């Protein structure tokens, strides 16, 4: 390994004494101020509320002008850039027809509005009635309050071997394909060769035929349950209208980076401020983490044994499911 000179000395070192050299202090202060002037100021007003490094980028949080909301900013070669937080829909009244999954196309049954799912956060059991929010983009139309949220799923029965998240599935006779993101079992079990349920899918191609084998790597896992799958089903209802995400003002931010999946390049950034919901950021999608707490404003965030932990005032503690923040 070679070394390269980055500067050349201009004579031998000279010792200077501030008590005897009246200009030394002012010279040093001038140099300090010169370097300070090179620092780009985070936009907004008041104190910087938190700074963190994620995926090689520096992020800072500071109240926007006026103090109504906080801005999330990323450092760049041209200065601080505000991060767009995207649009979201709150939902409730979930069903057993399948779960909302990232990458899926959804539509409003009444409005006909459409969007693509970018992130999902919810609390409670999906099969019995969960509540949460879904971050979306590529939006057309206007979603209405309390309308059914629909998406495409594949119904199956005769399940003999578990179908897992991210499995690539193929229809044995139709040649149709899709990638599985969630599996919902409504009755039966793989152990008794009679599992019944729904596959929440993305990247689907072709139309599946009733009773054809659903294969993974050429091996039968289940049978298609119904003609012309995938079919459009209701998975939840909107709880309000589409809104632009914002961050509550003030707070003191804590952060942690962690990869819950174990695959390369899937580390995400998690934050808590004490004034709003905790959040997740993957470099593209910002989503607030809903826990169901009455006052859902955690002060601290940490990861322990593949669980995300959030702490609240007066000692309350919430933790995620294993590997599922």
Give the residues covered by each predicted segment.
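Residues located in well-ordered beta-strands
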Residues: 105, 116, 135, 179-181, ...
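Recognizes the extracellular SEMA beta-propeller fold with strongest preference
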Residues: 1-111, 140-153, 158-174, 203-325
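Short, solvent-exposed secondary-structure boundary/capping segments
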Residues: 125-135, 187-200
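Short beta-strand-centered aromatic/proline hotspots
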Residues: 114-126, 176-190, 224-235
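N-terminal, helix-rich and Lys/Arg-enriched segments in bacterial and organellar proteins
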Residues: 130, 135, 178, 195, ...
